[in-house]
């Protein structure tokens, strides 16, 4: 049966069932859980600085999802981004340039506020790794929601509810389509975001690897060019 929301060229978003196998998703999920455990143990025994982010960190109160375990540029997930690039190019019909990954282990009560993403997230995907189900919503009209005086202002539309199972992913124009999640009612949910640029988009060359020398490096390697 034809899947709903499967035309990226038309809708600027689509759902890909079983983008990776359930076994690979579970492996990534358990790996990420263990990494969080390692971070917590090292932090508890003061083997790492509270400002260290190489094996993830708990987001600060002013970040997008506060007090939630987060990782910019997890090496395994950056490798996964490259693995999925041919599939992403097939789905979108675009030649893509990889930028970075961002992953979280969401907890009960977390909210992903309505927003649109920065330039590095032009072509994005959120991939369900495991845990409890948590829908993501997307507004298909790019004219809805905009930034005014440095603050994002939403039209508070109903949007489209997308439910992903482990291994499924939503591909979308992160810079054009508003997306969000309502308060999480489960206990834990693992997601990884993979971000690319279209090589026909002006400025993509200077943005390669999110302005880092290569993939896998932490955020402080970013440079303005």
Label for each model-derived stretch:
Residues 105:
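Conserved active-site beta-strand element of glycosyltransferases/polysaccharide synthases
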Residues 181-186:
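Short proline/glycine-enriched turn/loop segments at secondary-structure junctions
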Residues 207-225:
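Glycine- and charge-enriched low-complexity intrinsically disordered segments
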Residues 63-64, 180, 191:
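Short, active-site-adjacent segments that bind or coordinate small-molecule cofactors and metal centers
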Residues 93-102:
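A short coil-to-beta-strand element that immediately follows conserved catalytic motifs
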Residues 1-92:
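Non-heme Fe(II)/2-oxoglutarate
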Residues 108-176, 188-191, 197-211:
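Catalytic core of non-heme Fe(II) oxygenases with the double-stranded beta-helix
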């Amino acid at each position: 049966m034809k899947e709903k929301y499967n035309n990226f060229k038309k809708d600027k978003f689509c759902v890909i069932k079983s983008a990776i196998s359930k076994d690979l998703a579970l492996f990534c999920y358990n790996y990420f859980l263990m990494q969080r455990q390692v971070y917590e143990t090292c932090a508890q025994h003061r083997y790492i600085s509270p400002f260290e982010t190489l094996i993830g960190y708990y987001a600060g109160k002013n970040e997008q999802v506060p007090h939630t375990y987060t990782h910019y540029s997890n090496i395994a997930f950056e490798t996964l981004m490259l693995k999925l690039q041919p599939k992403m190019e097939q789905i979108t019909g675009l030649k893509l340039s990889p930028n970075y990954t961002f992953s979280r282990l969401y907890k009960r009560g977390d909210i992903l506020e309505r927003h649109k993403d920065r330039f590095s997230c032009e072509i994005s995907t959120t991939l369900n790794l495991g845990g409890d189900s948590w829908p993501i919503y997307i507004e298909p009209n790019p004219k809805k929601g905009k930034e005014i005086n440095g603050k994002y202002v939403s039209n508070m539309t109903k949007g489209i509810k997308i439910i992903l199972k482990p291994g499924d992913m939503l591909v979308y124009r992160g810079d054009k389509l508003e997306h969000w999640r309502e308060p999480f009612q489960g206990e834990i949910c693992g997601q990884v975001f993979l971000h690319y640029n279209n090589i026909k988009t002006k400025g993509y060359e200077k943005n390669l690897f999110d302005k880092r020398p290569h993939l896998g490096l932490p955020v402080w390697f970013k440079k303005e060019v």
